[in-house]
């Protein structure tokens, strides 16, 4: 009886100490840790190690969930579901190497080029997810979202907060980079960002056309050359092909699906 009362007293004290030291995960699991120590007759050092390990595990889990929430990932991003039979330009070996993230550690860039519906965004999102799991800060955003952030960061607290986050990132995926023409002032903003990222942060860029064709509309050879030089420096270019996944799996409101899409 005395032993049980002492255990309860020690548990309450440990919970109070843990909360005072801002160790919420330890405070939450003190009872489990004490029970395990008693059952296994752990040494003092083993008990202390268990206490610290529980706190570290909780913090790492919280950090992971925060990174995942802020990453901007779409609903589907699991590369284990990637359809190699449908896609052209990405095989199992190549994707496995990309998932190992060695290129991120080396600050290499990745350019995914191909028609709409060939898996560019899915691959980019999947690699961002792999980086998040590995403990990196990684984000996925469209070029339009990125440019809006860069243009408004001086007048918008939300934009400045987003800007500060992406400046700390190890990986930034820019989706739909060539969807719209780029204005000269936008190209300059993008150049400054990419220049700051060089040899520090990896970029993934998804594009439905070659970057050279996209930047032809700038009519400014100096800006075009500088931006291309930064974007393609230490860059692996992967060209994706095949039929559009969205067209093959499009949904209809009718019971008998008609494949005629009016083209």
Curated annotation (Swiss-Prot):
GO BP of this protein: DNA replication
Family that this chain belongs to: Belongs to the IS21/IS1162 putative ATP-binding protein family.
Keyword Glycoprotein belongs to the record: no
Residues reported in the UniProt entry to bind ATP: 114-121
Protein name: Insertion sequence IS21-like putative ATP-binding protein
Keyword presence, Nucleotide-binding: yes
Keywords: ATP-binding, Nucleotide-binding, Transposable element
Entry GO MF terms: ATP binding; ATP hydrolysis activity
Signal peptide: none
